[in-house]
Amino acid sequence: MAKLHFRPYIPNQTVLFPQRIDENIAATDPVRIVNAVIDNLNLESFKKLYKETGRCPYHPKMMLKVIIYAYMNNIYSCRKIEKYLLRDIHYIWLAGNEHPDFITINRFRNRVKEEINNVFTQLVLVLADKGFISLDVEYIDGTKIESKANKYTFVWRKTVERNRTRLMDKIRILLEQVDEAIAQENSIKDTSVEFTPCRLSDIVDELKEALERQPATKDKEEKKALRKKKKQVMELEGYRDKLIEYDNHLDTLGERNSYSKTDPGATFMRMKEDAMKYGQTKPGYNLQIGTENQFITDFRLFPNPTDTLTLIPFFHSFQYRYNRLPNICVADSGYGSEENYRFMQENGIEAFIKYNYFHKEQRPRYTPNPFHAESLHYNAQEDYYVCPMGQHMNRIGTKRDKTASGYITESDRYKAKRCEGCPLRGSCFKARGNRIIEVNHRLNQYKRQARERLLSEEGIKHRGRRCIEPEAVFGQMKYNMAYRRFRHMGEDKVTMDFAFFAIAFNIKKMCAKLIKEGKGLITVAKYMFMGLFITRYNWNIATCCQMHEEKAA
């Protein structure tokens, strides 16, 4: 009978010659791409973050490699990164056998919250230079990401303004009761007067001086009245402190309607993830990203729950980052407004952006409403509409409306003459008098242009790709990479965290594309990044970084 033999098992076996740490790391492992990419990025701006004296800090390239590789593997906790630096060979190799603790890792992230944006810009320019993207086409979409703040820490603008108005009334009534002379001097009976904390402090000081000047008395009634006035002065001080609190709330709100006490940068919005199905609001940010070939090319956070007002600031962010604008923009109907169409037309951007009811118009069974203003015949030369009964609707004026961004829209108003007794009146309109319609000719022209572009061969191609561009990125981000909620408080820290994620996402996507094409990662890494900053490309990035520093100054 044969004897059973096992392979030698000696955990404490020593070797004659020392081994390299990366001997057990495959040549096709994505960790090598991370190492090659970060080694060839320009991190000169990081040096100004460190002091020349004191203990030598960890090298920023090492810290950057470790954090980005952790983000690529869905690890966002500094404590988990610290743990992997002790047990995972990939992290040990990237760190050069260094072991920074979780506090050091977190401090590094917070320290580079401004410079990390330049790193993201450099990486995108590398991708553009190597043909992964062109920066000519921008697929834009947004999603709401919940903040780390508690959901019940809300501050509402309407509540603050209502309570502040009530507080003003209480202050006026109290001042009338305290001292009639001071009340007359400060016009407290005039309800249009607004009290400020500084003015209330002066009044409190004046009242205290007046009370101190009063002579001592033994009369019980006078003592009681004096105690009452002192109590009222203390109450007035409490009102002053409350007024300061309300003013601070309004300053923090800015143009928003709400914010969170624990994360003042977060705004309360309705999220798609609503378990109770009653429209609960949660603190969060509206994350807008631009993608091309499923790479993140730009991103920005907004407090707006809707996407309409975010497009123009997003283009400004793109221009600030790359010193140019894209040639083509593709987005859904949430961005289809007159202001956005006009901005893109004036800046030479070809807009493939849907408008409201575009999909409804493309349905086979769709029939336009014959009584709708857009279905009526319009005589452009004489500027009048013809109603379904054949009578003219002449122009009677222009209506101007102001949007939330301050943009002025103009709508021409047309009125019919004889609507009484019309057999179609019940179907045409139900208001009293003659029918009046409002038509925005400029917006209708933009819609016609958008319809022509969207129905063209190129428009159909872009519409098809829009579904697999930003939507695919959001799907990868939320479900495959478990990035569903921000882990920091404050807009600057949240922006920093997503910049790390965007860098990791783009490198991971690049690795996936190279593997799909059957190319060796280490060979491609050497080809892509060897001498990158010795060529003309170094000048482009240096110019971009210099432009950022000048604008920041």
Stretches found by the model and what they are:
Residues 26-68, 441:
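Basic, short loop/linker segments at the boundary and entry of helix-turn-helix/winged-helix-like folds
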Residues 1-31:
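Hydrophobic alpha-helical membrane-insertion signals
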Residues 8, 56, 67, 74-87, ...:
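Anion-binding and metal-coordination hotspots
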